[in-house]
Each structure stands twice: as structure tokens, then as C-alpha cells.
Design a protein with these regions (language model features):
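Residue-level hotspots at or immediately adjacent to binding/recognition sites across diverse folds
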Residues: 2, 33-324
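Bacterial N-terminal signal peptides
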Residues: 18-30
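Bacterial N-terminal signal peptides that target proteins for export
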Residues: 4-21
Length: 324
């Protein structure tokens, strides 16, 4: 029998709430004990709740609930769980190169790897156990950022040995996801329609006036100044001029959209609640709602494997999907 964590849908929903500051301290449902313990090795961990996925060279690395870290060397067909020194919920993972990677999550946890995700060590000092980190980004093996709830924004220039708190001058909004564009710009999406843009590697940030006041869960940078942002209640907006002006898209549904991806062939796919996907073949000018038959679970993120397939992570763990 497949063993699933109890109330999987509820845990998935709590991550949504984490990114919209509706749970406050209830989100830190773990404790110092859970943070300090090693993750339990579960034979079917790839079927548990997973919240983010990244590429590590030719491999894929996914992270999620109970400190689970999974590595796939065959494009997401099979997964191997890596030992992790925490049982906290992990919400973000990033690899600037095939060997160096970081994952972050609840209870102020920051983990690092130098072998492509096979082994991990703690980098946080345990003093921020009440922090909820939601995403991580690294330019290279030395310079990176961690962002999260209540305006948490940490920076490092020594590979995570030390972290410095910064404030991009917006207040204590929840920062949900940080993304790099093809021109080197950084995009930081958050609650209250927040989209911050940096053109200097993250030292300074400018707020884009997005005509939407709900939470944004991500930004998908395109070529030549194009950006797509997405979030609550099916909201999708597109800019052609680095965020100066925005055009909303009618998604025909009110589902929450959590992840976005542009494939090598140019197809854009956004994924969210209930197995709802939004596809665009014209650089985000128009979207078509698509529901894969038999796929009814919620998606937190998605990535293109080297063989051109799409691997999703979310409520049902890691799942390869076949696009129409």
C-alpha cells in the first residue's frame, strides 16, 4: 500500500497559506526537535508532498515535506532519497552548477550540498527557528539569496557560510519566489501584487506596479523584456517592457497557479490546483486551459527534463506528464 502523509491536501494548502501569510505561527508546525532530527528514509518518498524541483547537471532534485530530498538520474522516471539533517518542510531548492546546491524551508532551515544532492549539511545557525523560508537562488557557488515570509531576505557572498539580512524596501511582505531572467535581471514575486526587479544582481530593487493586489507566486521571464506573472484565482499578467506596463489574461478559471515553465520549443506551461494547466504557444499573449486526463492533483512546480518531457512536483509527489 502506498503510504501518504496524513492530510496531504491540507499540508499542500498550508504551503499556499504560507505564501499568503494566512497561517502565521501555525505554519511553523514543526519544532526544534523536528528541525534537528534527520529525515526519515521512506521507500515511497517520491509519492509524498513535494514543493520544488531543480536541475543539477543531468540530474533532477526535488524537495518537500518531512525533509525529503529526492534525486533522479533518469529524467524523473525513478527517484532516490538523499539523507537530510532535518524533518522540516523544504520549500525551495537551487543549483547554480551541477555540484553546489541549496534547499530552504520551515524552521529557518538552510541546507547545502557539494556533491549534486547526494549528501547535505546544515548552514543555518538555528537562531532563526521561527523563520519560514520559501525560496532560494544562487548566481554561482558563492553568491545567493534566501527569501521568505514576513519580508525575510538573506544574502551571502561566501557560499552560505555567513548570511546577511537585507530589506528591499517594501516592508514585511511575503516573498514567494525569486527568479533570474535571460538578461540577468532578477524578479522577486510576493503577496499584495508585489513584483520587485533588480538589474544589478540583487543589490537594488525597483517595484513594478502590477495591476493586481493579490498574491503572486512566481514570475516567468521571457526574451526582450517580456515577463509573465501568476498567482491567486487564476490571475496571469504579461509585460513586454520589463514590467513597466501590464496586460491581464482571462484564464477562465479561479484556480491558484503555483508554477511556470517555458520549454525549449517555446511552449509556456503554467500549473496549479486540481491538475489545471495553462498552455501558451505565442509567448504568453494567449493561454488555453488544459486538464490532463486522470491528473487531478495540485502542482507546486514543474521542470523540463533533458529528454523534453515535463516533470511536475506537488500533492502527488513527482509526476511526469505528457503534453497535448
Amino acid at each position: 500500500m502506498v503510504r501518504h502523509p496524513s492530510t496531504t491536501a491540507g499540508i499542500f494548502a498550508r504551503r499556499f497559506f504560507a505564501r499568503t501569510v494566512l497561517l502565521a505561527t501555525a505554519l511553523v508546525f514543526g519544532s526544534a526537535i523536528a528541525t534537528e532530527e534527520n529525515a526519515e528514509l521512506a521507500p515511497l518518498a517520491s509519492h509524498w508532498l513535494l514543493l520544488d524541483i531543480a536541475r543539477s547537471g543531468a540530474s533532477l532534485v526535488a524537495v518537500g515535506d518531512h525533509g525529503h530530498i529526492l534525486v533522479s538520474t533518469d529524467q524523473g522516471n525513478t527517484w532516490t532519497q538523499s539523507p537530510a539533517p532535518t524533518r522540516a518542510m523544504l520549500t525551495g531548492v537551487a543549483f547554480p552548477d551541477p555540484l553546489h546546491g541549496w534547499t530552504v524551508g520551515h524552521d529557518g532551515v538552510i541546507l547545502a550540498t557539494v556533491d549534486g544532492g547526494k549528501t547535505w549539511r546544515r548552514q543555518d545557525d538555528g537562531k532563526n527557528s521561527d523563520a519560514i523560508y520559501l525560496d532560494v537562488f544562487f548566481h554561482d557557488a558563492a553568491h545567493g539569496f534566501v527569501v521568505g515570509a514576513y519580508g525575510k531576505f538573506l544574502a551571502t557572498d561566501d557560499g552560505g557560510k555567513t548570511w546577511t539580512a537585507r530589506q528591499p524596501a517594501v516592508g514585511e511582505v511575503h516573498y514567494n519566489r525569486i527568479t533570474a531572467g535571460p538578461e540577468g535581471h532578477l524578479y522577486l514575486a510576493g503577496e499584495g501584487g508585489t513584483l520587485l526587479i533588480s538589474t544589478d544582481g540583487g543589490s537594488n530593487w525597483t517595484k513594478s506596479e502590477v495591476p493586481y493586489e493579490g498574491s503572486l507566486f512566481g514570475a516567468l521571464p521571457l526574451d526582450q523584456g517580456g515577463i509573465i506573472v501568476y498567482g491567486l484565482r487564476g490571475h496571469i499578467l504579461r509585460s513586454d517592457d520589463h514590467g513597466a506596463n501590464w496586460t491581464p489574461h482571462n484564464s477562465e478559471t479561479k484556480v491558484l497557479i503555483m508554477g511556470g515553465l517555458r520549454l525549449k520549443n517555446g511552449l509556456i506551461i503554467l500549473g496549479g490546483q486540481g491538475g489545471n494547466f495553462f498552455l501558451s504557444r505565442d509567448s504568453g499573449k494567449t493561454f488555453t486551459l488544459w486538464q490532463q486526463t486522470g491528473f487531478g492533483t495540485s502542482v507546486a512546480d514543474l521542470i523540463e527534463a533533458e529528454d523534453g518531457s515535463v516533470v511536475t512536483v506537488g500533492e502527488a509527489g513527482a509526476v511526469r506528464i505528457k503534453l497535448p
